[in-house]
């Protein structure tokens, strides 16, 4: 049942609980991808012709374009480089990037679709128990920075896989820096026993 629920949540392939011994599967919240349209772009012309585009060169040297399906935002640069953010899965990110490329083609530019690459996957989950961040920071000092007056979460820089985790006292976890989703899952399974070790005992 848990696996089915998780698969329904993910909206993609079914989840193998052998791979997720904690029984918790981080939800992908944001995918950042890049692609090279491989042609020079006139950003002013794009901003004038595309209805879902804004361009303020004094503020930022790229056209900001949005589409509703998949709900994403693209940053389009004069060099032909494009960054796509906001998708909830790798497939959606690629689909969105292709849609932006097609919009640029329809505006008369010879845009191609080269070197599509996932640059960052952001996932999150909730372990459903409070965590003693001071204790965790103390015993994992080499990987942790915890300065509650600056930021309420503990920042944990995992070496293998190379993932940054934000760990909150509430038990909410954010994982960032993955290039493939399995890195997100592995990082969470690595940290889970540590989190249970520093579980706050409710008085």
Curated annotation (Swiss-Prot):
<dbReference type="GO" id="GO:0006352">
    <property type="term" value="P:DNA-templated transcription initiation"/>
</dbReference>
<keyword id="KW-0539">Nucleus</keyword>
<dbReference type="InterPro" id="IPR012295">
    <property type="entry name" value="TBP_dom_sf"/>
</dbReference>
<dbReference type="GO" id="GO:0016251">
    <property type="term" value="F:RNA polymerase II general transcription initiation factor activity"/>
</dbReference>
<feature type="repeat" description="2">
    <location>
        <begin position="118"/>
        <end position="195"/>
    </location>
</feature>
<dbReference type="InterPro" id="IPR033710">
    <property type="entry name" value="TBP_eukaryotic"/>
</dbReference>
<keyword id="KW-0238">DNA-binding</keyword>
<keyword id="KW-0805">Transcription regulation</keyword>
<keyword id="KW-0677">Repeat</keyword>
<comment type="function">
    <text>General transcription factor that functions at the core of the DNA-binding multiprotein factor TFIID. Binding of TFIID to the TATA box is the initial transcriptional step of the pre-initiation complex (PIC), playing a role in the activation of eukaryotic genes transcribed by RNA polymerase II.</text>
</comment>
<comment type="similarity">
    <text>Belongs to the TBP family.</text>
</comment>
<dbReference type="InterPro" id="IPR030491">
    <property type="entry name" value="TBP_CS"/>
</dbReference>
<dbReference type="InterPro" id="IPR000814">
    <property type="entry name" value="TBP"/>
</dbReference>
<dbReference type="GO" id="GO:0003677">
    <property type="term" value="F:DNA binding"/>
</dbReference>
<dbReference type="GO" id="GO:0005634">
    <property type="term" value="C:nucleus"/>
</dbReference>
<keyword id="KW-0010">Activator</keyword>
<protein>
    <recommendedName>
        <fullName>TATA-binding protein 2</fullName>
    </recommendedName>
</protein>
<dbReference type="Pfam" id="PF00352">
    <property type="entry name" value="TBP"/>
</dbReference>
<feature type="repeat" description="1">
    <location>
        <begin position="28"/>
        <end position="104"/>
    </location>
</feature>
<keyword id="KW-0804">Transcription</keyword>
<comment type="subunit">
    <text>Belongs to the TFIID complex together with the TBP-associated factors (TAFs). Binds DNA as monomer. Interacts with RF2A and TFIIB. Interacts with CWZF7.</text>
</comment>
């Amino acid at each position: 049942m848990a696996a089915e629920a998780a698969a329904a949540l993910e909206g993609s392939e079914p989840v193998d609980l052998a791979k997720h011994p904690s029984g918790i599967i981080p939800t992908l919240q944001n995918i950042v991808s890049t692609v090279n349209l491989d042609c020079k772009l006139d950003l002013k012309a794009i901003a004038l012709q595309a209805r879902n585009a804004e361009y303020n060169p004094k503020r930022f040297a790229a056209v900001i374009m949005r589409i509703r399906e998949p709900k994403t935002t693209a940053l389009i640069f004069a060099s032909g480089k494009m960054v796509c953010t906001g998708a909830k899965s790798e497939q959606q990110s690629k689909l969105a990037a292709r849609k932006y490329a097609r919009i640029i083609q329809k505006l008369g530019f010879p845009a191609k679709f080269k070197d599509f690459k996932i640059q960052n996957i952001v996932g999150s989950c909730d372990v459903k128990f409070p965590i003693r961040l001071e204790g965790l920071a103390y015993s994992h000092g080499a990987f942790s920075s915890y300065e509650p007056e600056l930021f309420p979460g503990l920042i944990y820089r995992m070496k293998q896989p190379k993932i940054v985790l934000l760990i909150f006292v509430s038990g909410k976890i954010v994982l960032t820096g993955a290039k493939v989703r399995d890195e997100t899952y592995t990082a969470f399974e690595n940290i889970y026993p540590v989190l249970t070790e520093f579980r706050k005992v409710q008085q």
